[in-house]
Amino acid sequence: MPAPRTEPRLPAIIALLAVGGIYTALPPFLTLGPRWLLLAVVGALLIPTVVSLRTGHYQLNRVLGYVVSAVITLALVVSLVLLIKALPTRAEAAPELLRSAGALWLANILVFALWYWRLDGGGPLQRDRRGAHTEGAFLFPQMTKYSKTATEDNWSPRFIDYLFIAFNMSTAFSPSDTPVLSRWAKVLTMLQSAISLIIVALLASRAIGIL
């Protein structure tokens, strides 16, 4: 029996394509191979991912989802390593370096927002099956008894909620009003904050002539 699909997947698809699009704007020294390669790979993986969801092959859909998230994560890590290795010896203009900093910083937010969305509560499919979101890796305000109303009894997080967490982790280095409960989520949030700090510190400081 097909599982109900109440959570829209379009925001996550747009985020995945946005990560690929961001990489087309990076300078060559921050990518491996052609800059359009990541976008092409993501697009190619999204086709069977969407098809498997619509045809009810949910296990395959979940595996493909992990694969595409792993691909963009690997691309982010590779770019960060290339940045650390190459930045001290390069002489790019400050505007280009600032654009690169902004691009990688934004990619970092999207990559980890996708991981939070994909892993919390068993993923979007499991959240759909349960209906009301009463437990997970993050304690959203709507899950507490003090904020529940009659209209929030069946509340469940959407991609924008995880994007909000990821944005706060990269700007304020904290999840703001959403405590992190699970160990895996704590590890991911620490990793995201560390990557954001490295990107901002290295690229921004180089751009203004500190390095």
Stretches with model-predicted labels:
Residues 1-15:
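N-terminal membrane topogenic signal
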Residues 60-72:
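Cytoplasmic-side transmembrane-helix entry/capping segments in multi-pass membrane proteins
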Residues 87-125:
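Pore-domain transmembrane helices of cation channels
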Residues 156-211:
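Pore domain of cation channels
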Residues 121-178:
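Membrane-proximal soluble regions of multi-pass membrane proteins
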Residues 11, 32-45:
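Structural signature of hydrophobic alpha-helical transmembrane segments
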Residues 16-30, 50, 82:
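Membrane-embedded alpha-helical segments in integral membrane proteins
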Residues 23-36, 54-58:
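Short, hydrophobic transmembrane alpha-helix segments
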